Amino acid sequence: MKPKLKAIIIGAGGVTSYMLPALKNSFDLSLTIFDGDRLEKHNLDRQLFRNNQVGEYKARALMKLYNFRKDEGTAVSEYFTTDILDTEYKFFFSDCDVIISCVDNHPA
C-alpha cells in the first residue's frame, strides 16, 4: 500500500512532466496543479506532452496524460499568485502535505 500524499504543484512544464510519473507511482496522490500556460508546439521537444494536446492548458493536459481521475486531482488553469490564497482555491492549501514549485522563469 502506497503512502498518501496531498500535493500542490505550481507550474506544469518540463520539470513537472518528468516528475509527475514518479510521484504518482510512489504515492496515493491527491494533486492540484496551478498553471495558466497553454501548451505550444515548441514545448514538445522538452516536455512530455503529445502533439494532440497543443492548445490545451498544461495543467489539464498533464492530468489527462497521466490518467488522473477527478477524485485524484484538480487542474487549475490560472497562474499562481499570492492573491489565489484569497480566492475559492485557498482550501487546497489548508491541509496539503507539500507544495512543489516547478516554475520556469524568475517572475513566476
Model-identified regions with their sequence ranges:
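Adenine nucleotide-associated cytosolic modules
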Residues: M1-A108
